[in-house]
């Protein structure tokens, strides 16, 4: 067989593999609706209930990623800074709650001692 024939066969085989492979995978892959129908009823119900919440969480995450990407820093450093800010905020809320509880206890002691 001539070299041209060999090259032609290889081009045809490569085209079949490159085009036919993804087309075959696409044809056997189930759609989202087909996968959802395979769920048991409890999973279907839970999926429908949590779908909106998950979509909101994903949208919030994408929004945060966009904000982080606008800064000059790496996304990872920006995310770490935001986590540190949240931790500091939570810690300040805890300390404020502890202080309020301490003040309330002192007031209760004063009331009890004043009434005796």
From Swiss-Prot:
UniProt entry tagged with the keyword Transport: no
Pfam hit, one: CBP4
Membrane-crossing segments per the record: 7-25
Keyword field: Chaperone, Coiled coil, Membrane, Mitochondrion, Mitochondrion inner membrane, Transmembrane, Transmembrane helix
Coiled-coil region(s): 77-116
GO cellular component: mitochondrial inner membrane
Entry's localization field: Mitochondrion inner membrane
Main localization of the protein described in the UniProt heading: mitochondrion
GO process annotations (BP): mitochondrial respiratory chain complex III assembly
Bilayer disposition of the protein: Single-pass membrane protein
Region of interest: Disordered: 87-116
Family: Belongs to the CBP4 family.
Function summary: Essential for the assembly of ubiquinol-cytochrome c reductase. It has a direct effect on the correct occurrence of the Rieske protein, core 4, core 5 and apocytochrome b.
Family annotation (PANTHER family): ASSEMBLY FACTOR CBP4
Protein name: Assembly factor cbp4
